[in-house]
Amino acid sequence: MNPVDYLRISLIDRCNFRCQYCMPEGVKLDYILRSELLTDDELLTLIKAVFIPLGFTKFRLTGGEPLLRPGVVQLVRDIAALPQTEDLSMTTNGFLLSRMAKELYQAGLKRINISLDSLNQETFDKIIGNFGASKWQQTWEGIQTAYEVGFNPLKLNVVIIPGINEGEIEDLAALTIDRNWHVRFIEFMPIGNRELFSDRAWVPSEEIRQTIRQKWGLIESTIKGNGPADVFQIPGGKGTLGFISQMSECFCDRCNRMRLSADGWLRPCLLNETGQIDLKTALRQGIKTTELREQVREILAIKPNINYQERESGTQTGTYQRTMSQIGG
């Protein structure tokens, strides 16, 4: 198993989109009270006194939608300024990027992943649960702005949902031909969206690869990331195609990450909900960071067992209690 040096940090569980796979329609969401969110000071304390001493050097800011977090640019600046920070990135829906991308880049954010599940305005709005004025154009402009200010690599995250956007696989893959963009197809997961998942199921990565292969051919890329994606290229293309196959092709041996929710729960495995520890409450109760560090060290020691043996028994009820937006997936 890879060294665990990567922490995904959810800044907020709220979002200005309501994507079906992340915040399912009809599911009642109990949003975290602002007073229960980790404050900037608490988060920086945990990073500096708990995670960095244990070897964490790569940090990704997620949500919900992280750009809704008040003061997010200053938080980026503070994390980027830590001498041990080797990599600081963000996952966003892109809607606010057209006015925030430059400031984020100048603050020290160098890599960005943007969710883009459709190039069709109507389909895009359907997936994100938007019934008012379309949000497609502003999102697309945000992607363009992020690339123009210098984010490299710029990655686009795509979840293919049967019967909704599976007809766009070729169009989305084609974005990598003339642009140095990296499109990543992520298999749809049954976390907090059991009804939609049961209704729609998922498209295996190999089926997506085969669709692309039949159109243009597909070769393994010499560009490799530091995560679970299998990386390919369309011959002659400038960008890459990544496939994250958490449903069809177990990659637990390559896992190098943990997740910290916006309210301070540390989750060692995305699929395991029972092995989490509550760092925020302990911190607010005055537990020393040295003790918290030892608790995290213990979780690190058993993470391989959680990944390999407890991956499929990650809930006590058989149903995940939190949605992707609440976990910071």
Swiss-Prot record:
Keyword Disulfide bond: no
Names of the cofactor(s): [4Fe-4S] cluster
Cysteines engaged in disulfide bonds, as pairs: none
Annotated positions binding S-adenosyl-L-methionine: 21, 64, 115, 189
InterPro entries attached to this UniProt entry: Aldolase_TIM (IPR013785), Elp3/MiaA/NifB-like_rSAM (IPR006638), MoaA (IPR013483), MoaA_NifB_PqqE_Fe-S-bd_CS (IPR000385), MoaA_twitch (IPR010505), MoCo_biosynth_MoaA/MoaC (IPR050105), rSAM (IPR007197)
Protein family: Belongs to the radical SAM superfamily. MoaA family.
Function: Catalyzes the cyclization of GTP to (8S)-3',8-cyclo-7,8-dihydroguanosine 5'-triphosphate.
Name of protein: GTP 3',8-cyclase
Species of origin: Rippkaea orientalis (strain PCC 8801 / RF-1) (Cyanothece sp. (strain PCC 8801))
Top-level taxonomy: Bacteria, Bacillati, Cyanobacteriota, Cyanophyceae, Oscillatoriophycideae
This protein's encoding gene: moaA
